[in-house]
Amino acid sequence: MLNFFAAAPRGYEYALSLELADLGASDIKESVAGVYFSASLELGYRITLWSRIASRIIFVIHKGPCESPEQLYNAAYGIDWQMEFNHRSTFSIDFHGMGGFINNTMFGALKIKDAIVDRFRDDDCPRPDVARVDADFRIDAHYRRGQITIGLNFSGPALHKRGYRDITGEAPLKENLAANMLMRSGWQKNPVSLLDPFCGSGTILIEAAMMACDMAPGLHRERFGFEHWLRHNDKYWQELLDEAKARASIGITRCKTKFYGSDIDSRIVALAKKNAANAGVLELIDFSVTNALNVKVPEETGYLITNPPYGERLGTVTALLQLYYQLGDKFKAEFGGWNLAVLNSDVELLSALKLKADKQMKMNNGALECAFNLYTVHATNTRRVDPSNINREGDVSDIAVPFVNRVKKNIKQLQKWAKKEGIDSYRIYDADLPDYKVAIDKYLDYVVIQEYTAPVDIPESVTKRRLTDVLITLPGAIGIDPNNIILKTREKQKGTNQYEKIQANKLELITTEYGAKFKLNLKEYLDTGLFLDHRLTRKLVGEKSKDRDVLNLFAYTGTASVHAALGGAKSVKTVDMSNTYTNWAKENFALNGLNDDKYQFVQANCMQWIKTTHDKFDLIFIDPPTFSNSKRMEDSFDVLRDHVPLLSSLIKLLNPNGEIIFSNNKRKFKMEIEALEALNFTVKNIDNQTLPLDFKRNPQIHNTWLLTHGG
């Protein structure tokens, strides 16, 4: 008996061990990312030809302890390589594993290469050449926990490359993954009708058809690793190939299983047909170009096994949640009695199906860890799902009802108000209900959802489910395309992380506010470039700016400065520490046709700039951060602790009877009024005057003060 190792992705070991047992292997032992087994040479060939799960079959030549470079060298040198391959053959080494004395795989490969070359030389034989690409003889070495395994890559190129697929779709599924799905779902033991409504390039259906008609997965491969092996028995191999061809020919004619595949992309369906034709199973599969929500249910019950789109593959998660909910609705309505198996990397998408899984497994799709869930579908009604209603109210009426009702009520009130006010960006929901802790802002035809950090006593699973329900129901509640929903997570700000990018891609819009135009960037940063709660504060700045010199400190994107300029300010100076936001402020001025020299922009640490400037102003708007410990600032800043010295430092910048509009977002902020009055300030709280209607539900969103200095 010979010793072999069947390599496979992690998570496939159990299915692979069952398959090897069915094929006749003995001494089966599961390991990490593979299975050891024993077999005769003929059985080794058979397993290589018939394994649907394995990635590679390794003929093990040596296995033993290895604790040093010398032991590794000696292990390789001790093999009689002239028994394995001819010196005229090229060879290569694939080394896997690190740890101990091996800090990189190249080191291990070079040690084995040196040992092989030295062994040929010491046996008075010319040394074979190394070929990095398309070597005749590929040596495979695995190092793990002080053990080295050296062997021949018996199978050659990865076994998932069956030979029937030349080109793949946008998000291909490996053939051995598809085979594993079919086996673990239970379909292989009960090959009834099979449907894949997201068939892509057809991999699941083709693999299933090959199983059903008894076709060896390696039958279409052109190359195997043992072909240049000196112990190769071509007679055995040719007999196995002839047997496999005969079995496939008989199996195709006898196959009664029906296969159905569809995809929304006609080009991908054409590719699936080509792949099926290459595999010799096209006549068994009924392909169609169809939206998954329009798929007709076959007359006979069976299995629906699929790998639908998910965030890493296609589309946005928000839009996909809508799709998954509709799919779950369709399954329950039309697929009663069917078995369902779904592969997905996002458990939140699977939860949107609103189906209870009979079994949940982990299964890798390449480097991506996925969930593979099995369901038995029980019919709940007989209505058909209309995919054209995907965003209309009623489709999701059975979940998050209080949230949906509140959002509908809010939007009905706010739409008329916003139109009257002359604004097209506003907040429609702000954690109104304790179970749904999100803020929802509408920017023209887009919505940004900000998820607040949940209390520690709320289980993460509950928080995720509630957020999923929000994302599913919101498009229908307010009549918006789910692709136009952006999700962000808002946590307590620390230092400068409001400046950090959260996504590489941009989504820029132009919004209008009381006649002013502002650029928005909905995706790239946590904030969008416009603080909606300060809308009336900006308007107030504009109303107070006519014929006055205005200063905007901690100016962000300069929106208050724009209002000041449009309000007729004599001059406007905009100061912010961020180069990004200073340039953004300049863009906002350009959008409004404000290109005069009297509008100046300063990128500087505001605290330092206040100390050094000699400019005077009639109106100062200052909206400092609640807390900051930026690297560009010498000391940290806390608005509660430091607001008095900050405001006192502005006195020298004020003209007689000058005013300061001071705002911050510190909840439970307490103004040191007596200390400020001692500095000759008149202090007035103007929260009610500056809190917009869309923020009335959350009066603590900010606090605003008007300070007038007596001179």
Curated annotation (Swiss-Prot):
Keywords: Cytoplasm, Methyltransferase, RNA-binding, rRNA processing, S-adenosyl-L-methionine, Transferase. Pfam families: Methyltrans_SAM, RlmL_1st, THUMP, UPF0020. One of its GO terms (cellular component) is cytoplasm. One of its GO terms (molecular function) is 23S rRNA (guanine(2445)-N(2))-methyltransferase activity. It catalyses: guanosine(2445) in 23S rRNA + S-adenosyl-L-methionine = N(2)-methylguanosine(2445) in 23S rRNA + S-adenosyl-L-homocysteine + H(+); guanosine(2069) in 23S rRNA + S-adenosyl-L-methionine = N(2)-methylguanosine(2069) in 23S rRNA + S-adenosyl-L-homocysteine + H(+). It is found in: Cytoplasm. Gene3D superfamilies: 3.30.2130.30, RNA methyltransferase domain (HRMD) like (3.30.750.80), Vaccinia Virus protein VP39 (3.40.50.150). Its EC number is 2.1.1.173, 2.1.1.264. Residues 43-154 form the THUMP domain. HAMAP family: 23SrRNA_methyltr_KL. Specifically methylates the guanine in position 2445 (m2G2445) and the guanine in position 2069 (m7G2069) of 23S rRNA. Belongs to the methyltransferase superfamily. RlmKL family. This is Ribosomal RNA large subunit methyltransferase K/L.
